[in-house]
UniProtKB/Swiss-Prot annotation:
UniProt KW keywords: Membrane, Transmembrane, Transmembrane helix
Annotated transmembrane regions: 115-135
Organism encoding this protein: Homo sapiens (Human)
Localization in the cell: Membrane
Membrane topology: Single-pass membrane protein
Lineage: Eukaryota, Metazoa, Chordata, Craniata, Vertebrata
Region (Disordered): 1-34
Name of protein: Putative uncharacterized protein RPP38-DT
Length: 155
């Protein structure tokens, strides 16, 4: 990757390093330029889909959505000002992904939808009782009111 950079790009990068004191961050694409142990750390972080579960503390994911190596010489500078952060903020949290089978997810979604309907602030459980009563017993009663049944009483 380094060899593909234009001289103008390299000059801009050197100027930025002098100005802000930030060294070029080795990304996954050009990690081959690093020492063997740092290269191994990058390879471990990039090699598997479960890398988020066991990432070395020197590897982190920035805004570019790409894993990169945090060099010990890297200073915490942003726009020339040193930012003090606790170490635990810089470390990545372990991801505990809860993976449910599809029927279980659907069941949970339906249950939460029903609960959200019943727990509206303007409607209590008792408010729904008359509607449930009507919808349960009214259709069979309306089936009785057919033309033949009604005409029997009218004639």
């Amino acid at each position: 990757m380094e060899s593909l950079q234009t001289p103008q790009h390299r000059e801009n990068q050197d100027k930025r390093e002098k100005e802000y004191g930030v060294k070029h961050m080795p990304m996954g694409n050009n990690a081959g330029n690093l020492e063997p142990e740092k290269r191994k750390a990058v390879r471990v972080a990039l090699s598997s889909a479960t890398a988020a579960q066991n990432i070395p503390s020197s590897v982190h994911c920035g805004c570019s959505k790409q894993w990169r190596l945090r060099l010990p010489s890297e200073s915490l500078q942003s726009r020339g000002q040193v930012m003090k952060r606790p170490n635990n903020i810089l470390k990545l949290r372990n991801l505990d992904l809860l993976i449910y089978p599809w029927p279980e997810l659907r069941r949970r979604q339906v249950a939460s939808d029903l609960m959200s309907l019943l727990l509206l602030p303007a409607f209590s459980g008792l408010t729904w009782a008359p509607f449930l009563f009507l919808f349960t017993y009214l259709p069979p009663f309306l089936n009785l009111l057919t033309v033949g049944f009604v005409s029997y009483f009218l004639v």
